[in-house]
Amino acid sequence: MADKIKDAKIVFVVGGPGSGKGTQCEKIVEKYGYTHLSSGDLLRAEVASGSERGKQLQAIMQKGELVPLDTVLDMIKDAMIAKADVSKGYLIDGYPREVKQGEEFEKKIGAPALLLYIDAKAETMVQRLMKRGQTSGRSDDNEETIKKRLDLYYKATEPVIAYYETRGIVRKINSELPVDEVFAIVVKAIDELK
């Protein structure tokens, strides 16, 4: 089964909570027929299912802690295999959060062709998340939790970006720009993969 995904185009999408990476991923799916896999969405779906694993995950997430690496990786791999026949490529959103995760991903699944680093200022991300929290009802969208998530994000992500920069596959995208301008830059990066 895993052979099916061996030659697929894999794009890591990294960006803080509220950076706009979800929006950009939607646009990529629409234009390129990629499968968008968000580790956060996969985790939330597992929690919503009420399974035993879901209950354990919920307890971890409510504390604002990171979910164990193997759990996330298994969920991503299962989801990739499930979509292998219909997918033109994969957007792996919100992963890897640390270098070790990236290394494990490559061992078990494959190497990324590109890392899109969707970057916005910290205050922009806080504002966007506060606004989203008013409408989403997501329990992790309150200011204290948001700041904690951003701190965790920066600490974890900087080494990841540096690690992939040494391979020359990182494209830093300024997501302070209007959505369509951001997407134009994203398109350029993906088109270079062909």
From Swiss-Prot:
<dbReference type="GO" id="GO:0046033">
    <property type="term" value="P:AMP metabolic process"/>
</dbReference>
<keyword id="KW-0007">Acetylation</keyword>
<feature type="region of interest" description="LID">
    <location>
        <begin position="131"/>
        <end position="141"/>
    </location>
</feature>
<dbReference type="Pfam" id="PF00406">
    <property type="entry name" value="ADK"/>
</dbReference>
<feature type="binding site">
    <location>
        <begin position="65"/>
        <end position="67"/>
    </location>
    <ligand>
        <name>AMP</name>
    </ligand>
</feature>
<comment type="function">
    <text>Catalyzes the reversible transfer of the terminal phosphate group between ATP and AMP. Also displays broad nucleoside diphosphate kinase activity. Plays an important role in cellular energy homeostasis and in adenine nucleotide metabolism. Also catalyzes at a very low rate the synthesis of thiamine triphosphate (ThTP) from thiamine diphosphate (ThDP) and ADP.</text>
</comment>
<keyword id="KW-0808">Transferase</keyword>
<dbReference type="InterPro" id="IPR000850">
    <property type="entry name" value="Adenylat/UMP-CMP_kin"/>
</dbReference>
<feature type="binding site">
    <location>
        <position position="39"/>
    </location>
    <ligand>
        <name>AMP</name>
    </ligand>
</feature>
<feature type="binding site">
    <location>
        <position position="177"/>
    </location>
    <ligand>
        <name>ATP</name>
    </ligand>
</feature>
<protein>
    <recommendedName>
        <fullName>Adenylate kinase isoenzyme 1</fullName>
        <ecNumber>2.7.4.3</ecNumber>
        <ecNumber>2.7.4.4</ecNumber>
        <ecNumber>2.7.4.6</ecNumber>
    </recommendedName>
</protein>
<dbReference type="GO" id="GO:0005524">
    <property type="term" value="F:ATP binding"/>
</dbReference>
<keyword id="KW-0547">Nucleotide-binding</keyword>
<comment type="similarity">
    <text>Belongs to the adenylate kinase family. AK1 subfamily.</text>
</comment>
<dbReference type="InterPro" id="IPR027417">
    <property type="entry name" value="P-loop_NTPase"/>
</dbReference>
<dbReference type="InterPro" id="IPR006267">
    <property type="entry name" value="AK1/5"/>
</dbReference>
<feature type="binding site">
    <location>
        <position position="44"/>
    </location>
    <ligand>
        <name>AMP</name>
    </ligand>
</feature>
<feature type="binding site">
    <location>
        <begin position="18"/>
        <end position="23"/>
    </location>
    <ligand>
        <name>ATP</name>
    </ligand>
</feature>
<keyword id="KW-0963">Cytoplasm</keyword>
<dbReference type="GO" id="GO:0005737">
    <property type="term" value="C:cytoplasm"/>
</dbReference>
<keyword id="KW-0418">Kinase</keyword>
<keyword id="KW-0067">ATP-binding</keyword>
<dbReference type="InterPro" id="IPR028582">
    <property type="entry name" value="AK1"/>
</dbReference>
<dbReference type="GO" id="GO:0009142">
    <property type="term" value="P:nucleoside triphosphate biosynthetic process"/>
</dbReference>
<feature type="binding site">
    <location>
        <position position="101"/>
    </location>
    <ligand>
        <name>AMP</name>
    </ligand>
</feature>
<feature type="binding site">
    <location>
        <position position="132"/>
    </location>
    <ligand>
        <name>ATP</name>
    </ligand>
</feature>
<feature type="region of interest" description="NMP">
    <location>
        <begin position="38"/>
        <end position="67"/>
    </location>
</feature>
<feature type="binding site">
    <location>
        <position position="138"/>
    </location>
    <ligand>
        <name>AMP</name>
    </ligand>
</feature>
<dbReference type="GO" id="GO:0004550">
    <property type="term" value="F:nucleoside diphosphate kinase activity"/>
</dbReference>
<feature type="modified residue" description="N-acetylalanine">
    <location>
        <position position="2"/>
    </location>
</feature>
<dbReference type="GO" id="GO:0004017">
    <property type="term" value="F:adenylate kinase activity"/>
</dbReference>
<comment type="subunit">
    <text>Monomer.</text>
</comment>
<feature type="binding site">
    <location>
        <begin position="94"/>
        <end position="97"/>
    </location>
    <ligand>
        <name>AMP</name>
    </ligand>
</feature>
<dbReference type="GO" id="GO:0047506">
    <property type="term" value="F:deoxyadenylate kinase activity"/>
</dbReference>
<feature type="binding site">
    <location>
        <position position="149"/>
    </location>
    <ligand>
        <name>AMP</name>
    </ligand>
</feature>
<dbReference type="GO" id="GO:0006172">
    <property type="term" value="P:ADP biosynthetic process"/>
</dbReference>
<dbReference type="InterPro" id="IPR033690">
    <property type="entry name" value="Adenylat_kinase_CS"/>
</dbReference>
<dbReference type="GO" id="GO:0046034">
    <property type="term" value="P:ATP metabolic process"/>
</dbReference>
